[in-house]
Amino acid sequence: MKKKILIIVIIVLIIAGIGGYFYYKKNQNKPEDTLKEYVSKINEEKYNEMYELLNENSKNKISEEDFVTRNKKIYQGIDMSNMKIEVKNIQKSGKKRIITYTAKMDASGGEITFDNEITLNNEKGYKIDWSSNLIFPELEDTDKVRVSTSKPSRGKILDRNGKELAGEGTASSIGIVPGKLSESKEEDTNKIAELLGITADSINKKLQAGWVTDDSFVPIKTVSANENELKDKLLQIKGVKITSTKIRSYSLGEAASQLTGYVQTITKEELEENEGYTSTSLIGKTGLEQKYEARLKGKNGVEIYIEDKDGKRKKTLIKQDKVDGENIKLTIDSELQQNLYNELKNDEGLFVVMNPATGEVLALVSTPAIDVNKMVLGVTSDEWNEISNNEKTPMLARYSQKYCPGSTFKPITGGIGLSTNSLSAEDTFSYSGLSWQKDASWGTYNITTLTAYNGAKNLKNALIHSDNIYFAQAALKIGSKNMTSGLDKLKFNEDIDFDLNLAKSQYSNNGKIEKETLLADTGYGQGQILVNPVHIASIYSAFYNEGNMIKPYLEFKENASPTILVENAFSKDAANEIKNDLIQVVENPEGTAKDMRINGTTIAGKTGTAELKSSKDEKADTIGWFDCFTVNSENPYLFVGMVEKANNNGGSHYLIPMIKRAISK
């Protein structure tokens, strides 16, 4: 019996031993598992944990610190990510396993692919026999991996005639050669700082950078190449050196500053958010430089290669040629842009000029403005505070905002009334004097107008004399439903598809016109109505184009043809009636824009003054407007002009001679 039990025990032990052996073999660390774990640690940048996967022989050859430093410098230096391997073969050699595999990884120059092999030793699990050629097959322990970057040329921004609005220019780089400073280094540094408008601490910080030697040229600040007096003073200080450097340059400077925008060195936050840049890259900060950044910036050229201990190029791992940025040609006429800026530069205002036949935007002027060439060079904190705290907001692109249109809205009221058949050109209203209210339900609320005139109170005469009372009554006759649906059709409360962001025009704060008094005020361009200047230019183009609103655009097209933004924005008859009436605003001796007459040129236009106040009793600034277009001309122009603080300068009549000179040139 005991013998039987012993035999059974022995059999069980044998079975258990066999089972344990097979379980051990099944769950034993496989060499390919170690390789895959190693690659996973590379992707996770866990260099210390990579080191733990090395065999003892490798650890004796390289310390953990040196291993981490070498791998980290190489992988981070080439901007490696997403390494993947495909095992091709596993060869046994005693306790060793030799794995051949194909590796792929993303790097700053693109994808790097190579075949390689790795040897693993079974040391209580498979461990890696490591050397530098595990990083790249051709890499020896004394070699280095280098990354060479070639910067592309940033694309130019050109006007319609090919003139550069933004391109490459030169400036003067002010620097210091430390070994050539005089013995009175502190005194000289303070003097340099004072002349450059910076702190001595900022200079010393640059001089203390790790790469600086006595013979190094240490750039301190870039200034305009024309700063000859400043440069002469600086060169009198020992150790100062001035070199020429390339910069982004803007030929129109202030005249197109909000339009072109400007570039500056990328910030840390921008570098984290955007791909394809380095810490020294320039990036568009505002305007078209920002809008077209992806097209203008180009693509860096990158070469990643192995260099031997003698500094010789040994193997190119990947090479990507640089791609220069795209040149972008605009519809802008730089001469017109400059002329209009010169007219308005001392005021707070804007001009939008468009070809009403094609939609080409010929000028976008906003005043006052900053010198974008100074922004590229860099401004001091005091200079920046002066700009950002300026009450006249010189960085604001006024043409992108929305404003009360005043009487320039009256043609739109007329156009909606005629198009909806809720108003006819022959309709007349009965009232006398310069003040009117519908009835006693309005209480003390009255509509006022500036000028009494003889003749019928009809649409044409009301436009000629800019009669507020007529258009208030016309709006009431049109009705809230027709008015709001007509304005919705004109794309109020919508984003206008344009190259730059534009504020949405509105007819009220809540998207409704419910009160009679608000509807009446809306009729003559007051109330809560706010219109974007580019949008109103597009609306006025419908009076030129028999009712079709033309889409404005900024990027030049050969053989320009119009894109209709709103078909039949007004009926053909309505558009032609308004156009003919606006011609009389200029041609009629009593017209509010009679000063705009130019011999041989037919012009349709409308003056406007918008009151910026919340009640009739309040006194506040006004906005002056003048919107006009040439009729039946070979090269038609449509102008929208606005000036703030119009009660100080004559408003729309201040703008008329400016536009007149621009058309006559």
Question: What do the predicted segments below correspond to?
Answer:
Residues 28-32, 43-44, 60-64, 94-96, ...:
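Solvent-exposed, acidic/flexible segments
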Residues 308-317, 357-407, 412-643, 651:
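Beta-lactam-recognizing serine transpeptidase/beta-lactamase-like catalytic domain environment
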Residues 22-25, 36-37, 53-58, 104-106, ...:
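Second-shell loop/turn segments in exported
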Residues 70-350, 370-394:
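Extracytoplasmic/periplasmic proteins that interact with beta-lactams or build/remodel peptidoglycan
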Residues 351-356:
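Short hydrophobic alpha-helical segments used for membrane anchoring or interfacial signaling
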Residues 25-72:
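Core segments of small alpha/beta cavity-forming domains
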Residues 1-14, 19-22:
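N-terminal Sec-pathway targeting helices
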Residues 38, 562, 656-665:
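Short, gly/Ser/Thr-rich active-site loops of penicillin-recognizing serine hydrolases
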